[in-house]
């Protein structure tokens, strides 16, 4: 949390926890952030930074969905590769986080949703304290065994849209086995966010791994 040791006006002892949410286009990142906000906002002070290449569509979607008050959601237009904006040159996102913390210095959690990217996407440790990587079953049973930093190095790996498995010929047991092999001793969650399956597990992970609770 090197960037956030001193937040002007902050009265809480611990610095805000920055949670990066990444994954390919359509995997369910925005839905996950929306549901996390709606479920956690009564207990924690939350703000969100979204990333899109040429628009602020995810910011708009979260605002329309009522995830948080509009002023607590900021959209970043990266204007290029979404991977670069969260890793090689995260300055635009670091500045957005700073702006949000100027407005809400006592925020407990800053969710940073990346633009849709490939399996090589990772967050800079200067930008994110915890990383969650989301894929969806519809992308294919083989995705977990393809590896890539998002799958092997993320703090939490989420396999979303499990309800689609029978429609796309995916075997969830194979995906689970491949995931255990590719990221031994690292947690993962099988989820269907339409029914909230897996959501509580993600929240427990954020709260415990992020040291928000004992």
Swiss-Prot record:
Q: Name one GO molecular function term.
A: nickel cation binding
Which residues are the signal sequence here?
none
| Location within or outside the cell | Cytoplasm
Key words, A-Z: Chaperone, Cytoplasm, GTP-binding, Nickel insertion, Nucleotide-binding
- Primary location group: cytoplasm
Q: Show the Gene3D superfamilies listed in the entry.
A: P-loop containing nucleotide triphosphate hydrolases
Q: One biological process GO term for this chain? A: urea catabolic process
Q: Which InterPro entries match?
A: CobW/HypB/UreG_nucleotide-bd, P-loop_NTPase, UreG
Kindly list any coiled-coil regions of this protein: none
Q: Where is this region: Disordered?
A: 1-20
> What GO cellular-component annotations does this UniProt entry give?
cytoplasm
Q: Per UniProt, where does GTP bind?
A: 23-30
Q: Which domain of life is it from?
A: Bacteria
Pfam families, per the entry: cobW
User: What job does the chain carry out?
Assistant: Facilitates the functional incorporation of the urease nickel metallocenter. This process requires GTP hydrolysis, probably effectuated by UreG.
Query: By its UniProt entry, which PANTHER family does this protein fall under?
Result: UREASE ACCESSORY PROTEIN G
| UniProt similarity note | Belongs to the SIMIBI class G3E GTPase family. UreG subfamily.
Stated name of the protein: Urease accessory protein UreG
Q: Which organism is it from?
A: Leptothrix cholodnii (strain ATCC 51168 / LMG 8142 / SP-6) (Leptothrix discophora (strain SP-6))
Gene name in the database record: ureG
């Amino acid at each position: 949390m090197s960037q956030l040791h001193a937040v002007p006006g902050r009265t809480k002892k611990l610095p805000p926890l920055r949670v990066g949410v990444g994954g390919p286009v359509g995997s369910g990142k925005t839905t996950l952030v929306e549901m996390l906000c709606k479920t956690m906002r009564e207990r924690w002070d939350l703000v969100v930074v979204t990333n899109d290449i040429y628009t602020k569509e995810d910011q708009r979607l979260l605002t329309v969905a009522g995830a948080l008050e509009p002023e607590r959601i900021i959209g970043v237009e990266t204007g290029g590769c979404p991977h670069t904006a969260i890793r090689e040159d995260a300055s635009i996102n670091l500045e957005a986080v700073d702006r949000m913390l100027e407005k809400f210095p006592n925020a407990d959690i800053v969710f940073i949703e990346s633009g849709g990217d490939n399996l090589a996407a990772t967050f800079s440790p200067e930008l994110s304290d915890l990383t969650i990587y989301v894929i969806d079953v519809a992308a294919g049973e083989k995705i977990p065994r393809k590896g890539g930093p998002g799958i092997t190095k993320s703090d939490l790996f989420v396999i979303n849209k499990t309800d689609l498995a029978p429609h796309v010929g995916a075997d969830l047991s194979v995906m689970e086995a491949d995931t255990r092999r590719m990221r031994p001793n690292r947690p993962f969650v099988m989820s269907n966010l339409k029914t909230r399956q897996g959501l509580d597990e993600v929240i427990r992970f954020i709260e415990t791994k992020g040291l928000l609770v004992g």
